Amino acid sequence: MVDLRVVTMDDWPLWRDIRRAALAEAPHAFKSRLADWHRGGEKRWRARLEVPGAHHIVALLDGRAVGMAGGLPGDGGPPELRSVWVSPEARGHGVGDRLIAAVETWALRAGATALRLAVLPGNAPAIALYERHGFVATREPGDLLADGVTRELVMVKALRRS
């Protein structure tokens, strides 16, 4: 059984380990690289968890971290779904669905009416997951990637209270 756990600042080693696993297993899925996170030590890992109003979740299977997702307050816009990843062993079992739903619940409780994300345009499995959850591509230009040409695909979902 998979359990979801909200990550606190004291859980920074857990967050570090799952983030490193995600970047090592799926470097094609993230804008940052594993090497980017080797600098800064504990202070850098804690800084990500100390963002005011942020919400970070880890999926645990038999006590092992097998997935992660985060919600970050928007900078003048809707909050953002960030850093979604599920380990290969846990894929296809609804872990990604549960992580996304948990961030959506967090956003609704914070009063948001929409949730935004940015995904690398070649990440077809992630795009399909997000579309299944009701996210749609926008015309908003995403951040420019390292190649200086490609931009992230920005997607948004209208949130409704049930």
Regions found by a protein language model. Give the residues of each.
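Glycine-centered loop/turn positions within well-structured domains
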Residues: 79, 93, 153
